[in-house]
Amino acid sequence: MENSLLRPYSIGIVLEDKEGDSDMIKVMPSEQLSMFSGNLNEQKLNYEVNVPDSQGIKRESHVEGGVELVAKWIFSSGNRVTAPNVKKNESVLIYRFADTDEFYWETFMREPSLRRREHVHYAFSNLPNGINSYDKNSSYWFEISTREKHVHLHTSKNDEEPFEYDLRINTREGNLVITDDINDNITIDSKNRIITINHASGNKIEINDNDITMTNVGGSVISMTGGDITINCSNLNFNVSNATITGSNIQLNGGSVTANGEDLNTDLT
């Protein structure tokens, strides 16, 4: 069996912070420089490159360049979509494809003293078959970004799921939102001390600091069931069209009890 044409080339030192979501870095192949001394910026490396011509015959060429290489992320981390946000002076492993000038890189050490803000995206295919590439609408994915200050988890519904869901944490603004695709959502607004539950029907429960508001639209039912229900408050006001209180024993206790109305009917048996 022939050996792979993609093979380890050198341990490298990252020369500049990787830009944004790019897969490319500028790197110095440190193991190739052990014979050099002096200013590295003035050093040159000679590369032997075998490139096929238009007839497929390999021609050997010699290329001279500086100690800086441009390498592409080798994408060896399973479901990770975005390249690691390597910083200047981090260590990476450089690969070279055959005798070409194609170089690739991957991380191989943990260097927490060098790594800073990151943006990481993982995706998991939700396509049942076929040869099409999956995307954000046909995969389950999550994103953690200390650079953009958010965490986002998403499920798609392309494979017969009835609904899709999103969970978003915005650490810059201080809120958490859970939503589905039919307009149900739960929001925790830590900054303003508000917790809100919104139903697709328009019904709503909101806890705003010390105030609790329940909104029922469309004349539906609000039902409370329990062994004992106790309400302790300074004032209790009912504004209703019709009110019915039913029980085997009903007691009204107070310094004074007042009933006002056009008609007051009492049936004591």
Predicted regions and their residues:
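Hydrophobic packing positions characteristic
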Residues: 1-227, 232
